[in-house]
């Protein structure tokens, strides 16, 4: 790195020029992009918490993920352990002008603030809860889904390892794969909550709500102008509607089937048209038994 000659630029402009060399990098808003929020040294921060899963910690992470979804408006948020992944669809201009330095710092500081608010003060911790963030583009929708699949699989693998180590100790788990560890855990595995085993997906949805107002205190002509309901946005756990084309041959109408996206039966790893489901809200088509998940 070379020094800018002082006789060609004022001091303030010169210092800003150094700064801009490192802070002007931007994501491409025309492509999907992901923000991965990660707890800094949380192995130490959580070492005194209940094992294998401390539900006070899980709840605080879930609430933090919901606040990040509310604040930054990704199309999908996935939280597992001390990680939160935010998926953003292509747009004309990303928030904070797409500047990576600002996006990383603002998302990380927002996560740190809200987690500190949500964590139960009685939870035994070591050190401070700090988060970092890495924002990056992916080339297309399919790779965006694969990024989520990777995080989902990593979450399950780590959860299985935690439960197995808790049951028999670290040494007996050395060299074992996930299936072998699941055999060690046995029926105890299903006794843990879904969010501990598979993480949780969230998104923003529009919900019709009744207008909460005492119309008896209003003049009739005023009350008549106020609608009975209004549309509000809420952050909810992500459920997918399963495609049931086979039901068209039945002589009766079936109710729609909805499954949480973290379900081991109809989760993100099981959805054949995951890009259409996540990016366009279509009904989910599951892989057939024995059909391999396609990755390209």
For the regions a protein language model found, what residue spans apply to each?
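Regulatory and interdomain segments flanking nucleotide-handling catalytic cores
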Residues: 1-296
């Amino acid at each position: 790195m070379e020094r800018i000659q002082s006789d060609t630029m004022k001091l303030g402009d010169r210092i800003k020029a150094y700064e801009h060399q490192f802070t002007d990098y931007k994501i491409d808003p025309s492509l999907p992009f992901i923000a991965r929020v990660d707890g800094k040294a949380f192995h130490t921060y959580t070492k005194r918490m209940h094992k294998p899963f401390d539900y006070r910690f899980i709840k605080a992470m879930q609430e933090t993920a919901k606040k990040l979804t509310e604040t930054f408006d990704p199309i999908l948020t996935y939280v597992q352990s001390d990680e939160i992944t935010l998926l953003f669809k292509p747009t004309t201009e990303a928030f904070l002008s797409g500047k990576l330095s600002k996006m990383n710092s603002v998302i990380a500081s927002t996560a740190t603030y809200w987690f500190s608010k949500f964590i139960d003060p009685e939870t035994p911790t070591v050190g401070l809860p700090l988060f970092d963030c890495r924002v990056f583009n992916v080339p297309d929708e399919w790779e965006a889904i694969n990024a989520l699949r990777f995080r989902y699989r990593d979450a399950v693998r780590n959860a299985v390892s935690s439960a197995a180590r808790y049951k028999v100790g670290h040494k007996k788990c050395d060299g074992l794969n996930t299936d072998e560890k699941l055999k060690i855990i046995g029926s105890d595995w299903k006794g843990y909550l879904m969010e501990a085993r598979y993480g949780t997906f969230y998104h923003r949805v529009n919900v019709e709500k009744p207008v909460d107002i005492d119309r008896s205190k209003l003049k009739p002509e005023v009350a008549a102008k106020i609608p009975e309901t209004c549309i509000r946005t809420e952050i909810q756990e992500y459920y997918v509607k399963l495609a049931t084309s086979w039901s068209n041959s039945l002589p009766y109408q079936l109710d729609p089937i909805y499954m949480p996206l973290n379900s081991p039966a109809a989760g993100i790893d099981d959805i054949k048209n995951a890009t259409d489901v996540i990016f366009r809200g279509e009904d989910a088509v599951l892989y057939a038994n024995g059909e391999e998940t396609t990755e390209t």
